[in-house]
């Protein structure tokens, strides 16, 4: 089961917004991770995507986006969760996907998902026993396989469960138990989180994640010499989407100096002009609705549209090429 590819698809689609340059504003709900969840996330985070599941369920635009980008593997997980006794429409409140490196000098990436809510743990465990599901024991925790999804799950407590491959879950438990450093010691990512975690959908990326994302966003414009010059200045990024009163997207890239931010802004504007030359009507409208600016060592991208325009955008060739 290629959960890493699933994460790439989700993160790309959520940031498609940025890439398409296509999602926030304040909201009644916020997708915030609990302290228990944060303490189990590995230090070497490359990207986190966190979603308020209640907001998603109540937004036609959010559900349309979900339908377009949800990979089959996660649909299998959803089915497996329901069969285990969980009701994702009732029990699930927040959902997060964590892409991380297995070491500070490694490019080997692994992914875990975190679900938060009020879970009927006793009922779920009773169902596992009834089905004679064999658990993998790691110290005081038990990892349970989730049917044909290829993923397994471990419950940190009654409100937090983590799913992924068994090797990744073992690493997460090592982090939770203090055997490996956690997200809490990653100052740059924690700073980025404080800028966005009051939003219903948000993502933060570290230096490597930011440089990879911006290379994808810029497309052919990333091949120019200026990009190589400023790439090393891209130290972090974060974006949010909000589905109340249409769709809104905000992306910020931290460069640390004004010259680098202005250069990336110019490259991004050039990429927008290039895309307008061949884009569909809905794509051109989306690009017209996008503003790009830089200030104080930071690049900012803002996009806002109506639900109906966003629906048309999801069907556009540019969107399809980015999520398939």
Cite the ranges covered by each PLM segment.
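Bacterial N-terminal signal peptides
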Residues: 13-23
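A short, solvent-exposed beta-edge/loop patch
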Residues: 49, 146-178, 246, 291-310
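A conserved glycine-rich beta-strand in the N-terminal activation segment of trypsin-fold
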Residues: 152-214
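Internal helical hairpin/lid segments
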Residues: 232-259
